[in-house]
Amino acid sequence: MELNSEKISQNYEGILQDIKKYSPYPEKVKILFVSKYLGIEEQEALINMGYNYFGENRAQVYRDKLERFFGEKYENLVWDFIGRLQKNKIKYIITNVNLIHSIDSFDLLSEINKKAIENNRIVNGLIQINVSKEESKTGIYIEDFQKESEKYFSMSNVKIKGFMTMAPLDAEEDEIEGYFSKMYNLKKEYEKKYNYCSELSMGMSNDYIEALKNGATILR
């Protein structure tokens, strides 16, 4: 697959303009390139275009790409993990992940903390919230998180930097607005208690405008 660098650049610039237009704090917003469909050559092409913030959703592919893109040339690359993470796959990402977006249960958080201790690392993570309560999605309901939030922030080697969510693909614009507004309020609630809990990962190509209006800091 050959990448259309001109189209990518135009789309990127368009999103940058939307960030300035719609975000309450545009200086805090980051654009994450979801690289799960990219092979090594396509990834290299994006890197050569100057993009350096990537999200991968398969743990073993994450490991393989970081082994490939290693060394001085690639030292400014930032890699997040955005996919569903199985406990037995944590080992593939734990040594160098920048941010885990998909902590969808306390059990998973505890296991990540255990592996982080073993590797002498402090790992940054986001709690995945199932804001729409879809049965087909993983994630924690807002009210369930609020009931037991202290234990999520008590891990010795995992720092909860904020929250991640996805709106239903078939949701109407006003529904999406409602879901993202709930997430913004949740983030504000916990940022007051933990000033490092400042990230809100939400908004993809079909709904990022609504996400920006509601304080998203990471667009995927």
Regions found by a protein language model. Name each.
Residues T217-L219:
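Divalent-metal-activated hydrolytic enzyme cores
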Residues M1-N206, L212-N214:
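Conserved alpha/beta-domain cores
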